[in-house]
């Protein structure tokens, strides 16, 4: 019996020693860095999926790149991606969920200006940083101090295509077409209109449509009768392509030039428009052929993952992640929503793949970078002649 008690005590001492040793090993091992939780709400279905899907793909490439690096000091991005369905009500529901349930440090998105205008006041009320991925309306970032934008404001870049049309193409008269129920498209039209008027270009027609419209024959008939040198379209990619096809079918003068906004830079524009969109001129946030190590790395990674060349939306999604990571880095250790917001405000002359390669926020937290004038040639997007 005594021998048995001694054996049990010896076993207990051995077990205690093993437990202590294991505890020492665990204490010596560095703790895993906590993930930084970010919400992302994008239009993966519905009206704005044409830009929401590629921006999500660009987002994924950016997340993989950041998480493979030591940019955040061992921390990783945990991005919760949800579909808004191109619906404002769903977009509002998601930002509330990201804030309250998921305790996200910030939110990326949404895809459209109509969704962005809807959720921007909510972001300010909740005091959670919001960085739009592809929504362009100035009303979004001007809604309050918690909202930032990745794409440049219409007033900054849209004027460039109008100036190009007047100075390089000799356009003296223009017809304007835009989506009246989309704040971003209204802003794009207004920016182009202001530039055209400043150059004494004659505005021969101003026609608005709904973003859901697919039959433009009545509008086209009016435009043909007005005999413009060019038609400026502030519409989504599919609508723009459909409009141009119908205009060609209706017999618009082949000499009429079609001018547009960054939406033209979607693969859907060429896929749907085909030969009808040859020669279209637009201002772009991005050109995949731009030189530079980061862009080449992005294009290579995107092509490897999706077997195609990234478009405007993909580049904006990727850039949004890189800007978000820079804000987190600038927020310091143990970031909070307040310090992340401060991190956004610290961003100056940030290298990006957009425009001419340098990004800043203006005083209203809108994006600033130079656009690139592009055209469609032989079924591909290429820089327009200088």
Language model features: what each stretch is:
Residues 36-58, 62, 82-89, 111-114, ...:
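Extracytoplasmic "Venus flytrap"
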Residues 37, 50-57, 69-141, 150, ...:
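Beta-alpha junction/loop-to-helix N-cap segments that form part of ligand/metal-binding clefts
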Residues 44, 147-211, 230, 324:
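An alpha-beta-alpha
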Residues 91, 150-173, 186-188, 214-217, ...:
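Hydrophobic alpha-helical segments within soluble ligand-binding/sensing domains
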Residues 98, 102-111, 131-133, 175-178, ...:
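Periplasmic-binding protein-like
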Residues 244-318, 330-331, 375-384:
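Extracellular/periplasmic periplasmic-binding protein-like sensory domains
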Residues 304-314, 325-383:
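Segments of small-molecule ligand-sensing domains
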């Amino acid at each position: 019996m005594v021998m048995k008690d001694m054996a049990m005590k010896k076993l207990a001492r051995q077990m205690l020693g093993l437990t202590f040793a294991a505890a020492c090993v665990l204490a010596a091992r560095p703790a895993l860095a906590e993930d930084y939780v970010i919400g992302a709400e994008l239009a993966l279905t519905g009206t704005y999926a044409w830009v929401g899907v590629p921006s999500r793909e660009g987002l994924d490439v950016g997340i993989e790149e950041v998480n493979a690096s030591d940019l955040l000091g061992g921390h990783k991005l945990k991005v919760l991606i949800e579909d808004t369905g191109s619906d404002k009500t769903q977009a509002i529901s998601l930002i509330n969920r990201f804030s309250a349930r998921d305790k996200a440090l910030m939110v990326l998105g949404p895809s459209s200006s109509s969704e962005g205008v809807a959720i921007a006041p909510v972001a300010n009320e909740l005091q959670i940083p919001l960085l739009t991925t592809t929504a362009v309306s100035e009303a979004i970032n001007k809604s309050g101090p918690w909202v930032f934008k990745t794409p440049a404001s219409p007033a900054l870049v849209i004027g460039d295509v109008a100036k190009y049309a007047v100075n390089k193409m000799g356009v003296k008269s223009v017809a304007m077409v835009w989506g009246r129920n989309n704040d971003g498209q209204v802003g794009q039209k207004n920016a182009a209109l202001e530039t055209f008027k400043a150059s004494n270009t004659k505005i021969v027609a101003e026609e608005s449509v709904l973003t859901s419209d697919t039959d433009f024959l009545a509008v086209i008939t009016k435009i043909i009768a007005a005999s413009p040198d060019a038609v400026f379209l502030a519409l989504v990619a599919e609508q723009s392509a459909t409009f141009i096809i119908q205009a060609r079918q209706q017999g618009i003068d082949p000499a009429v030039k079609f001018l547009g906004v960054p939406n033209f830079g979607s693969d859907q524009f060429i896929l749907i428009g085909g030969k009808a969109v040859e020669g279209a001129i637009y201002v772009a946030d991005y050109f995949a052929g731009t030189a530079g190590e980061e862009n080449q790395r992005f294009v290579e990674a995107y092509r490897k993952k999706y077997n195609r060349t990234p478009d405007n939306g993909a580049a904006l999604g990727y850039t949004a992640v890189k800007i978000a990571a820079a804000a987190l880095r600038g927020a310091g250790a143990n970031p909070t929503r307040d310090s992340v917001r401060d991190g956004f405000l610290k961003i100056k002359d940030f290298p990006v793949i957009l425009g001419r390669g340098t990004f800043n926020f203006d005083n209203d937290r809108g994006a600033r970078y130079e656009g690139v004038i592009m055209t469609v040639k032989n079924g591909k997007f290429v820089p327009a002649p200088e």
